[in-house]
């Protein structure tokens, strides 16, 4: 998953036309601060930023560090900032940044491990905290299936599309100000299970989210939803959770 290169798919590329790729370089054992390093890479109309990075690693500088895996916008591994905007490296086409340069930086609001690789441990801790999985009452798995209607699935379908790419954390203006803010993706995934008819931990999860500033720190700017590559609306999930929590405080049965 880390630092792979696939030189065999780039051998037929000619250097007739190039574009400048400016990549953040940072070695914590040597550098006091991140710096940008420029590379002239081949330009092809069908290339994305990840292709250009793979070219650099395979042909110019094998020390460049970044994460990637599927190259298909599914795994969420290759999140980075491209010309200041949170993007998946496998979905950001070079043609959209002509004539260049294309400035590739690590995602904002995360500690840098090295070059484009960031430390995501805080996100993983927050994700575990909201319990994004189905919790049932029974002590053992019961017989049969837990069937759902199309209408029941549609309630949470959008939020289930999250791929944990963390672009929403890079875009969120609250995360750098309130580091303890649970954040968009974690709340969206919590909402996904809140709306799942098979789940039985709705009130427990809601108390977890509302018992601190987990949701109330959100200022509803909506940048998280704007940058999501899968069309998830974390801002909507946060507002829905706020509304449900408010009903629970004002009405004896949570508005039911």
What are these model-derived regions, one by one?
Residues 3-14:
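Short, Lys/Arg-enriched N-terminal segments with co-localized hydrophobic residues
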Residues 36-48:
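Short, contiguous acidic and Ser/Thr-rich linear segments
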Residues 47-62, 105-256:
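Ferredoxin-type iron-sulfur electron-transfer modules in oxidoreductases and energy-metabolism complexes
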Residues 82-104:
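Glycine-rich phosphate/adenylate-binding loop and adjacent beta-alpha elements
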